Amino acid sequence: MKIQTLLVAVFLPFAVAFAADPVTAISKNDKELQVLLKKQSLSKKDKEKVKGLLSDVFNFNLLAEKSLPKETWNGLDEAAKKQFASEFQRMVRNSSAKRLEMYRTDSTVYEAPKMKKNNTEANVTAHLWYRGKESVLVYKMNLVGDVWMAWDLVIDDLSTARNYKEQFSTILKTKTFAELLEIVKKKADENEE
């Protein structure tokens, strides 16, 4: 057991070092997204590509967990957690694909990542300019295997995870988790193309 612990302690830093830089993970994805958004209109295939790009960079399982009150999430069995995360992902992806204008930029500058927890968590700040107006985005990221994935996006000081958590907490004051899940499914269906 001590040998296994020692091997993990020795090799873990190397595994983290070989993972792509979190800024690279975000900027590569963003460049692909901007190429799509330069088109006058997006085909259904292009919109599916946008949804795929979101899935490539977002850890929807962690975002789903952080979007529910802790006691609610901890009270769910694994099947319910998986179902909620799946429907939540579908809702966010479909909603994002319908509001593509908010992702357009003329230029983007990324700050160096702020690393945390033995280089397994990072905050990446991006300054985006579109039509002369600047927005500041902070990607809260974690290392999943050897891939950097965002679990929260803070846009001009507004946290996506916190916003969903506040909405879902309000709903859960008067409705059951099953009813919340139906609301999420309905929203996902409404925004499906």
Residue spans of the language-model regions?
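Sec-dependent signal peptide recognition
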Residues: 2-9
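Juxtamembrane/interface motifs at transmembrane-helix termini
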Residues: 65-71, 101-107, 170-172
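A mature extracytoplasmic/lumenal domain signature
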Residues: 88, 114, 128-130, 141-143, ...
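Surface-exposed, charged secondary-structure patches
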Residues: 94-135, 187-193
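Early exported N-terminus immediately downstream of N-terminal targeting peptides
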Residues: 21-99
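Low-complexity, intrinsically disordered terminal/linker segments enriched in charged
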Residues: 152-193
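Sec/Tat signal peptide C-region and signal peptidase I cleavage site
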Residues: 14-19
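Short beta-strand edge/turn micro-motifs at domain boundaries
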Residues: 136-162
